[in-house]
Amino acid sequence: MILPDRWGQGQLFAFSALDGRALAGDDFPGMLCGDRVGVRFFSHVRRELAIVPLSGPGLTFDAVTSDCLVFGFPGQERMRMVYARPHLIIGSVAGCAMPAVFVEGPCRPERDGDTEIHDTLDGDVTALARCGDRFAFAFGHSREEAILLAREGLALSPEEEQARKLSFYARHGVGDDHPYARLYAKCLSVMKSQLYAPEGEFATVWSTPDRLPHQHMWLWDSIFHAVGFRHVDATLAQDLIRAVWVHQRPDGFIPHMADVGLTSDITQPPVIAWGAWQVYAFTRDDSFLREAYEHNARFLAWCRVSRRLTARELYTWNTTSDVNCRCDESGMDNSPRFDVPGPLAAIDFSCYMANDVRHMALMARTLGLEEDAARYDGWFRQIRDDVNAALWSEEDGFYFDLDLSAGRLHRVWSAASFLPLFAGVCPPDRAGRLAEHLQDPASFATVFPIPSISRKDPTFGTDMWRGPVWLNMNHMICEGLRRYGCTALAEDILRKTVRFADQWYRDDGVIYEFYDSSNLRAPSRLNRKGAPFEPYHIDVRLQAIRDYGWSSTLLLDMLRQLYPEKR
């Protein structure tokens, strides 16, 4: 069994809903430290649990997963740190090593027998209990709660808890002969860490983009998570999609972000039907399909009424004046597409609508709703025709947004303009011209494809959606290329995506939010709405986020596509 074994600062360490009651409203997540074997926990006042001293040659790691760390020196017993229960980390040490807690703020330390207590006077308390080579570190909202949980933790076997955690990879990992077995296992590790248990309005398990710094649910992130999770647990994948419409309003609107008792007032790309159809291919659960169909019918109807500014079937995102996030609704927050102040008939929004409408027709036929299917077919044709009539530049051989205020194409060379392939709205000759752009080294054929902005565009850079590579775009564009018969090109892009993501996992121990299209700069050195900040510090959050959810789920799906025979 091959396990993730690369240590890297910023890796997630958290309790998963797959193992019990992981609540978003009472979470105690951590990240691996960069300067020692330790975990920094994100309570109100930050705390760090570290193993000290760990000096000398030959320290190796057998497992570095999102809830289990196994490590040690040659000739010694292996040491471990396991997230065994909600708010409880247990472990064992060897040699002269011992656990230590460091608190990054006001704290009233105490000792009660074998237990060290850290009360930060804000309602959060941690306790570290030790017995021989074992230790237990617990978080609570009172001194008594933390002490009790830590002492209960000493009764647990770190070795048995380690075996329980790592059995997940035995069940769901791939064979040792898979060329990317370790990357596959790393994807599983991140995926596991993203899951919260049912809570409040959420009747099912639900997911979050990265646990830290995002701790809420996002619409299209959840769909991308489901696409990966269908290979692990297709029933769970259905639940991740169900969670998306928990906060749907009576008028059909679905918020882009939600949590227990919390919703936003903007939406996100309509990809629900597409995602539900991918999951349905695994489950053949007609009741789930009907549920998704009914909720999404209302959502698409809301989009048609609320996000269309012309008589044509072209769709417009909500935008703001925030220069770093003009279009959060599109998911492409700071793309130069939105540098213009006026509204755009957006190529991506229109294509997401076309693609979801097309999948609604497939769902309707499967459910025996022939009249609905015919209606969705007609709607799809309307979007297809309007996209090709209004958003195509014959001179450039490319699709662009339409600046509705100026009445002309807004010529920003963005990866969003390849989404007509994904939506299936391209005539074959135009699909061929798009493929040419993807093979042009001066434009989109970068070392690590596909840049979010073409190299020849004056806005091309290294800041988030202004040049770096995003795996969700690669996934959708490659699906579109295959639809149009460009199989070799799609496979080449997927192979490069996997190869370079694996390279950076081996170097840095994490799966990143986005990557450098030249593959020369570490993703941690790329701008994220500003210059990068080192060391990694999520309270500042000006770095590519580490152990990112959809990067992991879609990488796993790409590996399944590239190596279908490897299980």
Give the predicted meaning of each segment:
Residues 177-215, 239-260, 309-345, 385-469, ...:
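Extended glycan-interaction surfaces of carbohydrate-active proteins
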Residues 124, 223-224, 405:
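Short alpha-helical segments and helix-capping/turn motifs at coil-helix boundaries
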Residues 336-339, 360, 476:
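A short small-residue
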Residues 343-348, 370:
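Structured, solvent-exposed acidic/aromatic patches
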Residues 159-170, 181, 217-219, 355, ...:
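Short acidic alpha-helix initiation/capping motifs at coil-to-helix transition points
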Residues 215-334, 347-350, 354, 468-490, ...:
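Aromatic-rich carbohydrate-recognition surfaces in CAZymes
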Residues 1-181, 212, 483, 545-552, ...:
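Terminal accessory carbohydrate-recognition/targeting modules of carbohydrate-active enzymes
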Residues 150-164, 179-186, 233-246, 286-304, ...:
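Extended, well-ordered alpha-helical scaffold segments
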